[in-house]
Amino acid sequence: MKGTKMQIRIAFGSIIMMFVLALPSNADGKGELQKYFSDTANKVKSTENASEKRKILSESFQSMSEALDKVQNSGMISKVDRIGINRFKATLQEKRDELAGSNGYERVLDKDLNAFSDYVVQDMEQAAEMVTISLVALLLIIILVVLIV
């Protein structure tokens, strides 16, 4: 009887610990996405050549898009996560269109690429805050971005 009570206490304590530890992890996961775009902006600003800046931004968008697609198609995420990822992908696609000047957007001028990279960081941070993505999906995205890059 005492052994059973102890196992229940351990299980209950473990569940509580998982919830307590998951909260900061969730916030950190979104921070990792923000860091990804911030690192891209820093690379853009440290490069003088406009075509290189475009390449850095384009590759960053492509890597994130591939990671989002893989997570979305993995079957490991909920319907709510899929909806959130679709919203995030739509925002990302808008940035790609702005950079390239497609789908009704004017192409970002060479002289504005540094400012555009900052704008992307701010806009993607806001998108990450507005979109609901679970911890599991967020961690999968981060892992895949690291593996793709």
Residue ranges and their predicted role:
Residues 79-134:
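Membrane-proximal, non-transmembrane alpha-helical segments
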Residues 32, 39, 59, 63, ...:
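Extracytoplasmic/secreted proteins, especially bacterial periplasmic and envelope-associated proteins
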Residues 13-16, 135-148:
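Core hydrophobic alpha-helical membrane-spanning segments
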Residues 1-2, 20:
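Extended interaction regions within the primary functional domain
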Residues 8, 23-77:
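N-terminal leader/propeptide segments of preproteins
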Residues 16-24:
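Hydrophobic h-region of N-terminal signal peptides that target proteins for export
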Residues 12, 23, 128-129:
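Intrinsic disorder/low-complexity segments
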Residues 2-12:
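Bacterial N-terminal signal peptides that target proteins for export
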